[in-house]
Amino acid sequence: LVVPWPRAISIRAALALTISHLLVQALKRMVNRERPDATALIRCPDRFSFPSGHATAALAVALSYALTWPGLAPLLVPAAVLIGWSRVALGVHYPGDVLMGQVIALATVAGVAMMW
């Protein structure tokens, strides 16, 4: 049995990541939600927080690979979710930013999986 990896699987993950990134950047510019007022523990790449790009990217890649290798899902998906919520702990996002980023990732991966 020959598995068509890494090319096909990587292309699907890259496509989901690219589409979700474009959606996140468009929403950030439309919503213009400022980051939390609390002192952030890290430097932010821009001043807008909604939705979280890190939460979106981590979950989009994790779900893309988990669809191909379901056995990896128990490792990849919780790690991606924790990456997203670490953004709240670091003071650079509100919980809603992370949640919406994760919803975007889920929808994007589902859309790419249906098309690819």
Q: Where are the language model's segments positioned?
A:
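Interfacial segments of alpha-helical transmembrane regions
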Residues: L1-L22
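Amphipathic alpha-helical interface surfaces
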Residues: S10, L22-L27, A57, V61
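Transmembrane alpha-helix/helix-exit interface in multi-pass inner-membrane proteins
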Residues: L17-E34
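Membrane-embedded catalytic cores of phosphoryl/pyrophosphoryl-handling enzymes
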Residues: L41-W116
